């Protein structure tokens, strides 16, 4: 069986944590920021985790991560 290919777009966007979960950046932080409060923008700087529902899909995209 041939090697599985890593989805390069996904590999650039996700990192694996020590416990094996996938870390991601939050959306809505690139433009149209004037109407968002400082608190909202500050919270968007923090990283998020991939939901359990999406983790199965991500494991297929990132077999070696």
From Swiss-Prot:
GO BP of this protein: translation
Region of interest called Disordered, as start-end residue ranges on this chain: 1-26
Signal peptide: none
UniProt cross-references to Pfam families, sorted A to Z: Ribosomal_L35p
Keyword Repeat: no
Domain of life: Bacteria
UniProt-listed SUPFAM superfamilies: L35p-like
Matches recorded under InterPro entries: Ribosomal_bL35, Ribosomal_bL35-like, Ribosomal_bL35_CS, Ribosomal_bL35_sf
Recorded GO MF terms: structural constituent of ribosome
GO cellular component, one term: cytosolic large ribosomal subunit
Cited Gene3D superfamilies: 4.10.410.60
Keywords from the named record: Ribonucleoprotein, Ribosomal protein
NCBIfam families linked to this entry: rpmI_bact (TIGR00001)
Family: Belongs to the bacterial ribosomal protein bL35 family.
PANTHER family for the chain: 54S RIBOSOMAL PROTEIN BL35M, LARGE RIBOSOMAL SUBUNIT PROTEIN BL35M
Name of the protein described by the UniProt record: Large ribosomal subunit protein bL35
Naturally occurring in which organism (per UniProt): Clostridium novyi (strain NT)
